[in-house]
């Protein structure tokens, strides 16, 4: 049964893809990029006003959704008995991917190129690593639940492999000054990563919801709650 948590990956997928293609369309229409000179990188499309404002907002909201998804996934893996160090490694690679996405949106290529490239490294490289770690985890941990149809695992492997190949191709082609080919690889990698995040909808479909637990500090100087008072240690996250 689908729930609001399973909608998060779908919302991220639709939001990110629609957002960056809208930015591309605006850049082409207002002449910020010229397709006759070659296919542009995503960052070039988002470097000039007014689409730079939209670009930053799209990536900031996308980064926030990514962090939310990574945290939900972290707790899901924890409840499945995944070791803490493995789960923490996966979580932080996802959070750093989200941080890189936000950096890319806020530090445009034409204004702060070194910072922008650092953000792109986090977004693409660690984003790809995040999904490889998720995939390898399904092999490391025996008996780990595999929600969804059996072909999902094979599809994720294919998408991760293609993403890795295209990242390498993107870097090599850029070094060879084949910018249009490199830019096309970048766009495809971005679409693949959005798709991989979107597939978390399958994993989250078995969840009913999530709760936030508040643990009060143990201090004898604090007044004790009166008998019969409402339990304030758990609040439902809406």
Swiss-Prot record:
Residues 1-8, 73-86, 138-156, 208-238 are cytoplasmic. It comes from Mus musculus. Residues 30-51, 108-116, 178-186 are extracellular. Belongs to the DRAM/TMEM150 family. Keywords: Autophagy, Cell membrane, Cytoplasmic vesicle, Endosome, Glycoprotein, Membrane, Transmembrane, Transmembrane helix. Modulator of macroautophagy that causes accumulation of autophagosomes under basal conditions and enhances autophagic flux. Represses cell death and promotes long-term clonogenic survival of cells grown in the absence of glucose in a macroautophagy-independent manner. May have some role in extracellular matrix engulfment or growth factor receptor recycling, both of which can modulate cell survival. GO terms for biological process: autophagy. The lineage of its organism: Eukaryota, Metazoa, Chordata, Craniata, Vertebrata. The keyword Glycoprotein applies. It is a multi-pass membrane protein. This is Modulator of macroautophagy TMEM150B.
């Amino acid at each position: 049964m689908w729930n609001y948590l399973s909608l998060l990956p779908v919302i991220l997928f639709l939001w990110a893809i629609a957002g960056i293609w809208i930015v591309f369309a605006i850049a082409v229409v207002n002449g910020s990029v010229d397709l006759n000179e070659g296919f542009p990188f995503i960052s070039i499309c988002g470097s000039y006003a007014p689409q730079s404002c939209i670009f930053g907002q799209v990536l900031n909201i996308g980064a926030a959704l990514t962090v939310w998804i990574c945290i939900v996934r972290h707790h899901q893996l924890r409840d499945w008995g995944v070791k803490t160090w493995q789960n923490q490694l996966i979580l932080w690679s996802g959070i750093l991917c989200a941080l890189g996405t936000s950096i890319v949106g806020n530090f445009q290529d034409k204004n702060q190129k070194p910072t922008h490239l650092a953000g792109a490294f986090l977004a693409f490289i660690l984003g790809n690593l995040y999904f490889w770690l998720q995939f390898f985890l399904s092999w490391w941990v025996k008996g780990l639940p595999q929600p969804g149809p059996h072909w999902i695992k094979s599809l994720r492997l294919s998408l991760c492999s293609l993403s890795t190949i295209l990242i390498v191709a993107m870097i090599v082609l850029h070094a060879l000054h084949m910018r249009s080919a490199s830019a096309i690889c970048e766009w495809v990698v971005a679409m693949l990563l959005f798709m991989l995040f979107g597939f978390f909808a399958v994993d989250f479909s078995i969840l009913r919801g999530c709760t936030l637990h508040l643990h009060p500090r143990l201090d004898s100087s604090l007044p004790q709650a009166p008998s019969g008072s409402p339990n304030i240690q758990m609040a439902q996250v809406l």
